[in-house]
From Swiss-Prot:
Entry's transmembrane regions: 17-53, 58-88, 94-129, 138-164, 181-218, 223-258, 269-297
UniProt key word Signal: no
Signal sequence annotation: none
Positions of region (Extracellular loop 2 (ECL2)): 165-180
Residue numbers on the Extracellular membrane side: 1-16, 89-93, 165-180, 259-268
InterPro entries with a match to the protein in the record: GPCR_Rhodpsn, GPCR_Rhodpsn_7TM, GPR4_orph
Entry membrane topology: Multi-pass membrane protein
Topology, Cytoplasmic side: 54-57, 130-137, 219-222, 298-373
Keyword rRNA-binding: no
Organism: Danio rerio (Zebrafish)
A GO molecular-function annotation: G protein-coupled receptor activity
Glycosylated sites: N12, N172
Protein name, per record: G-protein coupled receptor 4
Amino acid sequence: MASLRGSETMCNITTSCNVDSNIDQFFQPTLYIIVIVLGFPTNCMALWAAYMQVKQKNELGIYLMNLSIADLLYITTLPLWIDYFVHHDNWIHGQVSCKLFGFIFYTNIYVSIAFLCCISVDRYLAVAHPLKFAKVRRVKTALLVSAIVWLTEIVANSAPLFHDELFQDRFNHTFCFEKYPMEPWVAGMNLYRTFLGFLAPWGIMLAAYRGILRAVRGNVSTERQEKAKIKRLALSLILIVLLCFAPYHVLLLWRSVLFLINPCDCGGEENLFGAYHVTLALTSLNCVADPILYCFVNEGARHDVGRALATLLGLFQRGKSPETLMGASITVETPLAVKKPDFYSEVKTNAYKNDIEVLKDECLQMTILSVKK
């Protein structure tokens, strides 16, 4: 431990890795602008669609709302990061703003992953165990789980708020939320982020969708076309999480391991700098993929959003009250907004028959947002 602290002091005093910040001037700003242009309006519409589901007492809407909120918070940080990269990785907005926007930026990566995991588990319970876990899949439970997710990720990622996050390099650039070589506490935090923030939720998602596919294959009442759609959607979710987040966490883990082996070695940092920044930028594509995957590929939700936009345009043209929007554009039986049946009231009359019918309804109507209206 003493030698590690000595290495940290030596690195702080004598070592500043010669990373090429010029490579960030075009790719990251361009990508972030695209994410803002596409991600902000689509997440706003996804947030509205999720709110409509919550009004229908659908617990899935809670997770989707939180996912959209996390994406929108992430997007609000991008303008300052665009400015940062345009100025060759030079933060000009002070220590407080660096801490705040860096904290929001990185925390919401893991909040998004966590809520994608919650959605996966919720869909697994809806498809594979619609009766057994009916009481668990409620709005109150979803609210409690959401609060736990936010609290856990905020606490787990709060360490940078208590450290200086502005660092000068040898070219007088002011780095924000990055130091080359990294600090020991950052390496430890990166290990937590990689294994518990990314790999653990992704493993749960893989297990959940494996269970979904197994349940779908064993359900004779689901049409062949619907089964294929469910499988495509499940695979799309896994691939999006893999493509958006896995490259970044591979390099994050690589950098951290290299540092722990040789704390003051700049060779690895300099070689990985460009690729690391590219993979970090690619995580932003999740903000575009989330609303597309969970809302706009779905016929019912897409129809709702189209009706809402048409109604909104009509209100502006005719000058009517905006309140008419709330009652004029809800497709109650979209795959996202189907109300769960009251299992226990109907079972009183004919338990066996109604259990079978409810099971069929759940499997047909609640299979990963993909049942046709």
